[in-house]
């Protein structure tokens, strides 16, 4: 009798019941604990590193961490189905915030410029950076769209996803904020691969992007071109840029090398950082501070924690049971890992300085809270898995 009643239920209700059963029986046994642990480790390491140079900011960062954990607790308790249902609305609201940043007649008291960039909306005593949260809402929107196989198998479908992705990218570039904008392309490629897009379609898009990338150089801001020029000059051994356009990169490499294997310690590291005059040492260049204070061991710890976060996210996607959950997890993992890759690469002189922050580690309330909300989404997906694999869920 029970079987007959169960089979007579609508398919969506049977799927929901299967999901709820899995959530209640194995809610505490899933891979999302690995990203949670890695995120907590990175957050605490970041607070300690910030305290090396700016003790007052370390206290504020701890407060941001508490807010992030509370928000994560709320989001993680929600079912991922409402995230799929409202994904496009959340994305549209975030895009509207990005447009609002570029409206010329909005007073500086509301949209607060910093170093010539309009990235922050003033909310009382705090500043909110929409580009941090749009990364998550974009992943949710793309996952909601790409979960249907018909979308990704056609070249027109791939082009449509690229056009949608170009909207937040263009708005972020106009702020200007090149570092955040460059994350979307590789993350979209990974999500398309996970969704089952044809390799020849992705190869065509990748080739076009590689051909057009050098053509964008003349359209970059002057400081962005200077950073690229400085990298090439340093690679060629031209030290004349070390006191000019390559000053920040040179100081970062010098400080990172000063830590040696085990680090210089808090007092000596603080002195080295002070006299080397490293710009943005608590935000963009926090990895240099970690390498200086804790040496190669600290740098490796950042990489291990970052890789652990990405691996845990990919495992959540592999075991999600739904295409939506798989794509969200893969998108989140690739976004966070790529950000870590670019930040550490620019700090040790392998990539041009872009101003990209180190996830969970760099000082900043918007970034830290948004990243913890993102981690909570992984937790929601992992703790409410569907039995088998359901393309429609």
What are these model-predicted stretches?
Residues 22-39:
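N-terminal membrane topogenic signal
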Residues 183-184, 267-274, 305, 347-355, ...:
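Re-entrant/interfacial helical elements at transmembrane boundaries that shape
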Residues 35-248, 284, 288-348, 373-377, ...:
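Hydrophobic alpha-helical transmembrane segments of multi-pass inner membrane proteins, especially
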Residues 261-297:
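Long extracytoplasmic/lumenal interhelical loops at the membrane interface
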Residues 246-266:
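Extracytosolic (periplasmic/ER-lumenal) interhelical loops and adjacent juxtamembrane/interface segments
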Residues 243, 277-278, 369:
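Residue-level "hotspot" positions that anchor or transmit function at local structural transition points
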């Amino acid at each position: 009798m029970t079987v007959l009643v169960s089979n007579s239920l609508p398919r969506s209700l049977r799927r929901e019941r299967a999901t709820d059963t899995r959530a209640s029986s194995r809610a505490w046994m899933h891979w999302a604990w690995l990203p949670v642990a890695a995120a907590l480790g990175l957050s605490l390491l970041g607070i300690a590193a910030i305290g090396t140079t700016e003790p007052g900011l370390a206290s504020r960062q701890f407060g941001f961490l508490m807010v992030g954990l509370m928000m994560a607790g709320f989001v993680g308790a929600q079912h991922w189905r409402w995230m799929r249902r409202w994904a496009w609305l959340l994305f549209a609201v975030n895009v509207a915030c990005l447009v609002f940043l570029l409206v010329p007649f909005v007073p500086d008291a509301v949209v607060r410029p910093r170093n010539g960039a309009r990235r922050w909306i003033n909310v009382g005593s705090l500043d909110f950076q929409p580009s941090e949260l749009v990364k998550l809402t974009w992943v949710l929107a793309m996952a909601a769209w790409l979960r249907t196989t018909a979308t990704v198998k056609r070249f027109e479908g791939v082009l449509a996803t690229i056009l949608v992705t170009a909207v937040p990218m263009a708005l972020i570039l106009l702020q200007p904020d090149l570092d955040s904008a460059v994350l979307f392309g590789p993350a979209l490629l990974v999500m398309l691969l996970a969704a089952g897009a044809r390799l020849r379609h992705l190869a065509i898009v990748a080739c076009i992007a590689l051909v057009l990338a050098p053509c964008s150089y003349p359209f970059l801001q002057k400081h962005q071109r200077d950073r690229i020029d400085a990298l090439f000059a340093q690679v060629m051994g031209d030290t004349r840029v070390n006191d000019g356009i390559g000053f920040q990169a040179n100081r970062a490499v010098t400080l990172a090398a000063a830590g040696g294997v085990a680090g210089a310690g808090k007092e000596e590291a603080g002195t080295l950082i002070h006299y080397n005059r490293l710009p943005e040492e608590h935000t963009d260049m926090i990895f240099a501070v970690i390498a200086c204070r804790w040496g190669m061991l600290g740098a490796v710890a950042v990489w291990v924690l970052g890789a652990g976060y990405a691996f845990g996210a990919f495992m959540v996607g592999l075991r999600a049971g739904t295409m939506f959950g798989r794509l969200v997890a893969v998108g989140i993992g690739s976004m966070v890992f790529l950000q870590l890759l670019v930040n550490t690469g620019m700090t040790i002189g392998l990539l041009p300085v872009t101003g990209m922050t180190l996830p969970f580690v760099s000082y900043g309330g918007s970034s830290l809270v948004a990243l913890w909300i993102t981690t909570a989404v992984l937790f929601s997906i992992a703790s409410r898995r569907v039995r088998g694999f359901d393309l429609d869920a």
